[in-house]
Amino acid sequence: MLKSLIILGGAAALGAAHFTIPNDDQNMTGIVANGVPYAKRVEYMRKTNEALFRQSGPCPFAAYGTIIVNHTSDEVVCEGANFRTGDPTIHGEISAINACTAKFTEMGMTATQIFAAWGQLSIYTNAESCPMCASAIRWAGFKEYVYGTTIQHNYNKGWGVMTLSSYDVFQQSRQLPGYQTVMLGQILTNETDPLFSWQYDESEPCPNSCVRQFSQTRGYSTCTNITAIPSM
């Protein structure tokens, strides 16, 4: 029964009528914010994708990667990706926040110091955050939130998503204390969009030299890392 529901859910997503997600066009291409050149944004979004590939391989189905950046020292502090652990909250953003929390704790920082640190850091994610992660970003009080692919793009490509934009989450968080996080959307989408285009659309090419193979689990072809396929 559960399997039938999953299959029906996927079919419904692929066959759904077009829906425009309100306030999801926040294109900040070329924008200079907080003194950071746009070229630096592109550099760190590429590093976000690279962090994903290191942790999850060249074509993970859940291609969500995140890094946390200190622009003052020009360095990546922590990274994360979506992991299947059974914990439904471990999205890339939460994974990276957890990694930084553990790192800061090991450095001897107090809880108060850790809370204060988020306001000096920028979180980069290669796809727009779901409402849960966007809320976590605002609760943390990050200095900046920078994302690539939009929720609208992923909805159009058949992903099951919550159709609430980060913009609207942020609009409802204005009363939170602390830093009002700067949001920069749709950075380097020409490189992030392809990572999310192939999962439910067999006409889309595989990223990073992966190849399509039929998936018994999903009932259609998905992209596979050819170096991970055992030789016969």
Give the positions of each predicted feature.
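Short, glycine-anchored, charge-dense loop/turn motifs used at functional sites
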Residues: N70-V77
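Mobile, glycine- and charge-enriched loop segments
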Residues: C100-A127, T217-M232
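Fungal secretory targeting signals
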Residues: M1-A17
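A short, polar/charged loop-to-alpha-helix boundary motif
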Residues: R84-N98
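Short beta-strand scaffold segments in enzyme catalytic cores
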Residues: A63-N70
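Short beta->alpha transition motifs characteristic of CBS
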Residues: V77-R84
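Short loop/turn motifs at secondary-structure junctions and domain boundaries
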Residues: S56-F61
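Zinc-dependent deaminase
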Residues: H18-Q55, G119, S135-M232
